[in-house]
Amino acid sequence: MSSEIKIVNVVVSTKIGDDIDLEYVADVLDNSEYEPEQFPGLVCRLSDPKVALLIFRSGKLNCTGAKSKEDAVIAINKVMEYLREAGLDLIDTPEVKVQNMVATAELGMEPNLDDLSTLERTEYEPEQFPGLVYRMESPKVVLLVFGSGKVVITGLKNKEDAYIALEKIKNTVKELEEEYF
């Protein structure tokens, strides 16, 4: 039985041009904020797809909040088209790279976090945070495992690694249960 993995955030980066005039962009781009004394980039929020784009003077752009790489690319293309219409000279086809994906899933069981905390690469301080932090080496991701069986997986580069990580943590939990009972 395959568990459902839900991608809840995708962060991508790209370069859209060189030496972007952020003051000008802030004037012509709706739903944008540029306050260089607080943050060096311009923040633009879109509602469809619902994302935030961070545009920097260097031409670097980060897109966060997307539910897929495809949604992030759609958002980037929308903003680039608008900026081209406003007179900016931008890269024709920017290379979009996934920096991080966050997924949620269910273990289908309630793990004993005290038992799990005996494993290497784990941190569990229930007085500080209710979840156990497990730093998996392969795939190289971080899992937040909760006593309810809910799991948050961060540091993903693709959805396939989420399935691999979930299967590994499920097997680890089952092995520990057998060992302790």
UniProtKB/Swiss-Prot annotation:
Positions of Sequence repeats: 7-83, 98-173
Record's keyword annotation contains Transcription regulation: yes
Molecular function as annotated in GO: DNA binding; DNA-binding transcription factor activity
The keyword Glycoprotein is assigned to this record: no
Record-level GO BP terms: DNA-templated transcription initiation
CDD domains assigned: TBP_archaea
SUPFAM superfamilies attached to this UniProt entry: TATA-box binding protein-like (SSF55945)
Alphabetical UniProt keywords: DNA-binding, Repeat, Transcription, Transcription regulation
PANTHER family: TATA-BOX BINDING PROTEIN (PTHR10126)
Stated family: Belongs to the TBP family.
Function: General factor that plays a role in the activation of archaeal genes transcribed by RNA polymerase. Binds specifically to the TATA box promoter element which lies close to the position of transcription initiation.
Name of the protein in question: TATA-box-binding protein
Organism, as annotated: Methanococcus aeolicus (strain ATCC BAA-1280 / DSM 17508 / OCM 812 / Nankai-3)
This protein's encoding gene: tbp
